[in-house]
Amino acid sequence: MATALVSLEGVLMTEVGDPIPDGVRLYRVIAEHYRTVLTSDMSVQKTDHWLRSNMIFGYADIYDDRYFFEGQDLRHRQIDYAMAQGKVELFIDADADYCAYALSKGIPSLMFANPKFVRSKRPVKPWEDLRSEVERQRLALLDAHLGSSTKRFE
């Protein structure tokens, strides 16, 4: 079964710990068709408690803060760890930077934006970074399918 990586913060939960109903609905649809792995900034005990308290079940695993090394970005490390475990078919997050990082690794990404969630822990980079990554991926795919002009025989 294909694996989907879904972020807890911003997709299922607000910064104060309230569930995001639209995100929970999205998760339930995704969980029917994918092996769903949740990523979290909290410990596995706190994450598991929050999920049980909000009746969210059916996930395969939780990647929490123990996958973090000093000097690394936690979500980047979680994406890399998930890729080391097998093919990741879908990545869902509320942060454009992390979606751009997943795109750069070749993972289809879905950015979930909900007005109930506003990230205040760190400022979000401009949309131009995401646009430039999408354009870079498009050009790489074109080059892979068509080849460069030096390789073509016409």
Question: Where do the PLM segments sit?
Answer:
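Alpha-helical substrate-recognition element adjacent to the catalytic core
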Residues: M1-D73, H145-E154
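C-terminal accessory extensions appended to soluble enzyme cores
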Residues: S120-E154
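Acidic, Mg2+-coordinating phosphoryl-transfer loop and its flanking beta/alpha structural elements
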Residues: G86-P126
